[in-house]
Amino acid sequence: MSSQICRSASRAARSLLSSAKNARFFSEGRAIGAASVVHATGKVPQYASNFGKSGSGFVSNSWITGLLALPAAAFMLQDQEALAAEMERTFIAIKPDGVQRGLISEIITRFERKGYKLVGIKVMVPSKGFAQKHYHDLKERPFFNGLCNFLSSGPVVAMVWEGEGVIRYGRKLIGATDPQKSEPGTIRGDLAVVVGRNIIHGSDGPETAKDEISLWFKPEELVSYTSNAEKWIYGQN
């Protein structure tokens, strides 16, 4: 279940609970239990229809129906910090050719315009040994040595970006490894011509992202913060 659904369910559930805060049905947490069972089994349990009574009469059936309809009721008490923890992080590097061609701001702008958040950045010239660690999964390929020589040939802008779906969509923003096969609108499709000079690298999965971030950055070099734009990007209130 996406965190967007969780957020929507959380807001709706809190509204329902606030409107019915004096009802024993809600104060005893029975609504949460009933909704959780409905979400897990697809069936309304018998007890759910019997818990509408309170000391002052019957709780409005519309409130009960509305609450039981929430598919994410089990998550409705998650706060903003818990949701922030669901954000992915990915490693993105602008290679020496991208740096030398003055494309740093262009590439950063594309990620920012999408709504992703920069949480780590540095400029460095990696050694060949460091480049070999970065490309360790390609060490059996015939082009491995050339890749390492090129990555260590000049300055690299190493970055960590954060956001929902940033690993998968970051790859889409970058485009195919071969710029000739990259769609127009992607970074490589618009700004690169040949495979050997495709200007940018991006993690291809969660485990790769974790490994590459830990290789290029120390934990204290990454920051965690809430951007003022997040409520406009993700709909958080």
UniProtKB/Swiss-Prot annotation:
PROSITE patterns: NDPK, NDPK_LIKE. Its cofactor is Mg(2+). Residues 1-84 form a transit peptide. It is an enzyme of class 2 (transferase). GO terms for cellular component: chloroplast thylakoid lumen; cytosol; mitochondrial intermembrane space; mitochondrion. Its EC number is 2.7.4.6. GO terms for biological process: CTP biosynthetic process; GTP biosynthetic process; UTP biosynthetic process. Keywords: ATP-binding, Chloroplast, Kinase, Magnesium, Metal-binding, Mitochondrion, Nucleotide metabolism, Nucleotide-binding, Plastid, Thylakoid, Transferase, Transit peptide. GO terms for molecular function: ATP binding; nucleoside diphosphate kinase activity; zinc ion binding. It is found in: Plastid, Chloroplast thylakoid lumen; Mitochondrion intermembrane space. InterPro entries: NDK-like_dom, NDK-like_dom_sf, Nucleoside_diP_kinase, Nucleoside_diP_kinase_AS. It catalyses: a 2'-deoxyribonucleoside 5'-diphosphate + ATP = a 2'-deoxyribonucleoside 5'-triphosphate + ADP; a ribonucleoside 5'-diphosphate + ATP = a ribonucleoside 5'-triphosphate + ADP. The keyword Lipid biosynthesis does not apply. ATP binds at K95, F143, R171, T177, R188, N198. Disulfide bonds: none annotated. Homohexamer. Major role in the synthesis of nucleoside triphosphates other than ATP. The ATP gamma phosphate is transferred to the NDP beta phosphate via a ping-pong mechanism, using a phosphorylated active-site intermediate. Shows the highest specificity towards GDP. Belongs to the NDK family. This is Nucleoside diphosphate kinase IV, chloroplastic/mitochondrial. The lineage of its organism: Eukaryota, Viridiplantae, Streptophyta, Embryophyta, Tracheophyta.
